[in-house]
Amino acid sequence: MPGWQNCPMTLSPSHPLMDGRTAESPLISAYRGLKPSRRPVWFMRQAGRSLPEYRKAREGTGMLESCLLPELASEITLQPVRRHDVDAGIFFSDIVIPLKLAGVGVDIVSGVGPVLESPVRTAADVAALPTLEDSALDPIREAVALTVAELGTTPLIGFAGAPFTLAAYMVEGRPSRDHMGPRSMMHADPETWQALAGWAADVSGQFLRAQIEAGASAGQLFDSWAGSLGRADYERFVAPASVRALDGVRSLGAPLVHFGTGTSEILQPMRDVGVDVVGVDYRLPLDEANRRLGGTVPLQGNIDPALLTAPWEVLEAHVRAVVEAGSAAPGHVVNLGHGVPPTTDPEVLTRIVSLIHSIEP
């Protein structure tokens, strides 16, 4: 049920989608299943450690602090757009930022990832969770506004972690290999799980809505850990929370993208939460993903990050194969099938962008 097609836009007249800046950009055209003026491409984690200018900008500043300093977050978001000529900026943030803004004790520990002061594992823990106040989102709005002012006709994509991934971090208290904690809670204590997933859905939706209202031209929901779930559990315990998160955003009318890793078997229910575009990781060819989805939505993806260090002729052949497979879908935005590895040579990404733009849309 694509969001933008069924919702009148409620954005301000000065929003980039409304004032003519981005509505006909290659990215937004492809997201809407229309023929773009050139093939759009951007990269998940394009703003990050692969760029020397990013490492310099972040010197002495922690990850979460970097996300909450509007001028720094804006500069980091803009860096790969300047360098690579990609067709979108992706807002620089972290999945756990909405938790931090709500007042949940969380930090990024080097070599580990997000770590919570107190995991959330009981009904009492969930009941004690704070509310995300609207004013807490002001640094996000400011960063988006600064970024959009610089991007001009290049759209900004808003970013939020999906409720399951947020809740999984909260139950485990840190990254996990098998996500046994949240998967067990779904069945052992479904009421507590539902309450936690609902809380996560609300903060995720608030976070994404704030970015789009402030100027982002699209939004992407990242469900990093959804691939750990079987289809039945996803549909019963996770999809309703993702619907709830997007319900707070869909009325804005901006295109919405849904991406997770290892999600080849749940692409249909991921689409059915109410998005316009489905991101596909590197494990499934795009023509097969399109077949599974019945040719109903544009796709995004799915260059294998492992090939970024391959000889150029090997990588070029792979990129061309991705473009060819993507042509089966109603629309295609080229991306990686995962985030940019920190050790990636930035020149390789620039070269991929040039190659994509040289292929007729």
Regions inferred by a protein language model and the residue ranges of each:
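Active-site loop segments of alpha/beta catalytic cores
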Residues: A136-P361
